[in-house]
Amino acid sequence: MVIPLRNKYGILFLIAVCIMVSGCQQQKEETPFYYGTWDEGRAPGPTDGVKSATVTFTEDEVVETEVMEGRGEVQLPFMAYKVISQSTDGSIEIQYLGPYYPLKSTLKRGENGTLIWEQNGQRKTMTRIESKTGREEKDEKSKS
């Protein structure tokens, strides 16, 4: 079978377009910067008995865990959320889901790899907790 020269160039052109289109497709987004476990940097309080507190952000939940005097590690009820906006400065705004959480929070990168969490008029600067293997915690839930 002989293909005319004009058709060969057409086929080559289509192949080139397909390669360019497939190469320009958006790559899968990397894990958001705020996923993982963060130390709230909370100083032990004289009355509440909380020694330390951590926050874990996953794909759709915020889980706070406190280490309390005499009780050990206590996980507070998780809060489901959704991302509602992202600013040009890289900060994101999340809204909590559920009847008791009509509130919003802002998460943004701080200096030296910290996370700034603004919620209920409070501003917390948190540092990432590294796992025992020395790697950053990436507690993203896997989808089933």
Swiss-Prot record:
InterPro entries found in the cross-reference section: Calycin, DUF3255
Record's compositionally biased regions (Basic and acidic residues): 127-144
The UniProt record lists the keyword Signal: yes
Protein origin, superkingdom: Bacteria
Coiled coil: none
PROSITE patterns listed in its UniProt record: PROKAR_LIPOPROTEIN
Keyword Membrane: no
Keywords on record: Signal
Segment forming the signal sequence: 1-23
Region Disordered: start-end pairs: 119-144
Gene3D superfamilies in alphabetical order: 2.40.128.20
UniProt protein name: Uncharacterized protein YxeF
